[in-house]
Amino acid sequence: TAITRKDIAVEGEIQRIFYNNEYLGLVVRDEAKTGYQLHIYTSEGNENAVTEQDELHTGYAFQQRNIVMYDADYCEVQSFSGRIRFAREFGNTLYTVIPGDKFKTYYLATMEELQQIKLR
């Protein structure tokens, strides 16, 4: 397996970092605005996409070309272009979101249950 190293210049303060074998995600506070920018880079270090975000979430994960963002009671799945594919608030505490092995399948773990979600 080849390892690629590339320096990436970031304007603003990095708030979150998440990655998988294909992509690196950086959530950066946008100093000029009141929100955040989500930068997605390929494993070679090339910028793939940038989206504007209003909120900073607790957890982030990739599933193919989607980004899963979640907090204690909220989950959102967004495409790399920023299109919201799923957004839901939960009455229970959401511990984690696990991308499934099939495209558009996710598992949401709360204290009471494990829910499977399949997006259309």
PLM feature spans:
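Surface-exposed loop/turn elements that mediate protein-protein interactions on large endomembrane-trafficking
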Residues: 1-11, 32-53, 72-91, 111-120
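Acidic (E/D-rich), amphipathic helical modules within compact regulatory domains
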Residues: 5-6, 24-26
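Repeated scaffold domains used in trafficking and secretory/extracellular systems
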Residues: 9-22, 52-65, 91-104
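Long, low-complexity regulatory tails in eukaryotic proteins
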Residues: 25-29, 40, 96-97
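Residue position within the beta-strands of beta-propeller blades
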Residues: 25-28, 69, 107-108
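Short strand-connecting beta-turns/loops that link adjacent beta-strands
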Residues: 31-32, 102
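Periodically patterned hydrophobic/aromatic "hotspot" residues that form packing/interaction faces
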Residues: 62, 67-69, 77
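Hydrophobic, glycine-enriched assembly/anchoring segments
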Residues: 97-118
